[in-house]
């Protein structure tokens, strides 16, 4: 027989983005830029925030831009208050430096500086949550090393773990009014990698050769993962991996 679907019973399963107010920290480059453009394409009114004023003024297509450093707590608080109320809050801002190499040989000041990403996210979540509307969402970008740390990635792993732990703890505090999730990318082709041409291709080949999908991902693919956790109203307190099988790779 014909399947009868009660549309009222599934109403609200997915957030409609048309007319929703979205704020994307780190929204003018890499994964953040891809997210900004995808949200705008889906009808959201997007404000992209960057610590570099030149980048912040480079977008068009109805996308608003603001300059703000996520490590400047007062500036973060002010810009979020200005943009309130917010339906969708995303932070993909790196916030600081990245330290690589064996922990026992690592400059501990460099290791400490890596945690600026966490403090930037903490500022955005702490001051953003009070301006997110009922039924809204917050999404953080972590990273695959959080749960599969390869040699030399202790700083990335530590910071990623801290970001995801904060997300899970905050999810309990803000539920059911707000949902908060993390999206964890693997190796992604973004401007953060300085190498060019064949050197860049070889670097990505070496980094992904043991992945189940042996290539670097694209920022647009991560943005699709971010869009998923934003739109699905039954997802909170979780991490969605967009990593080409990084977590299942052989050492």
Describe each model-derived feature in a short phrase.
Residues 60-74:
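Rossmann-fold cofactor-recognition segment
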Residues 164, 173-189, 235-242:
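Conserved Rossmann-fold SDR core element
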Residues 102, 108-123, 130, 137-175, ...:
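Catalytic loop of short-chain dehydrogenase/reductase
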Residues 187-210, 249-251:
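A glycine/serine/threonine-rich, flexible loop-to-helix segment
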Residues 25, 86-95, 140, 181-185:
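Rossmann-fold scaffold of SDR-type NAD(P)-dependent oxidoreductases
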Residues 94-110, 194:
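Conserved mid-core segment of classical short-chain dehydrogenase/reductases
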Residues 215-242, 247:
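C-terminal substrate-recognition "lid" of short-chain dehydrogenase/reductases
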Residues 28, 36:
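N-terminal Rossmann NAD(P)H-binding glycine-rich loop of SDR-like oxidoreductase domains
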């Amino acid at each position: 027989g014909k399947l009868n679907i009660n549309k009222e019973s599934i109403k609200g399963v997915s957030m409609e983005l048309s007319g929703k107010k979205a704020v994307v920290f780190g929204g003018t480059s890499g994964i953040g830029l891809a997210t900004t453009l995808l949200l705008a394409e889906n009808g959201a009114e997007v404000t992209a925030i960057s610590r570099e004023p030149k980048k912040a003024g480079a977008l068009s297509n109805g996308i608003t831009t603001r300059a703000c450093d996520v490590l400047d707590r007062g500036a973060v608080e002010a810009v979020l208050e200005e943009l309130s109320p917010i339906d969708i809050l995303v932070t993909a801002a790196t916030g600081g430096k990245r330290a690589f190499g064996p922990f026992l040989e690592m400059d501990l000041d460099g290791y400490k500086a890596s945690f600026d990403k966490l403090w930037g996210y903490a500022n955005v979540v702490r001051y953003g949550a009070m301006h997110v509307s009922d039924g809204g969402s917050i999404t953080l970008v972590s990273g695959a090393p959080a749960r599969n740390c390869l040699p030399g990635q202790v700083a990335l792993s530590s910071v990623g773990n801290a970001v995801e732990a904060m997300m899970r703890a905050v999810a309990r505090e803000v539920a059911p009014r707000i949902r908060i999730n993390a999206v964890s990318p693997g190796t992604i082709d973004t401007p953060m990698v300085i190498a060019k041409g064949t050197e860049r291709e070889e670097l990505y080949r070496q980094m992904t050769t043991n992945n189940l999908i042996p290539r670097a991902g694209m920022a647009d693919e991560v943005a699709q993962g971010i869009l998923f956790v934003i739109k699905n109203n039954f997802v909170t307190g979780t991490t969605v991996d967009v990593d080409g099988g990084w977590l299942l790779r052989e050492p």
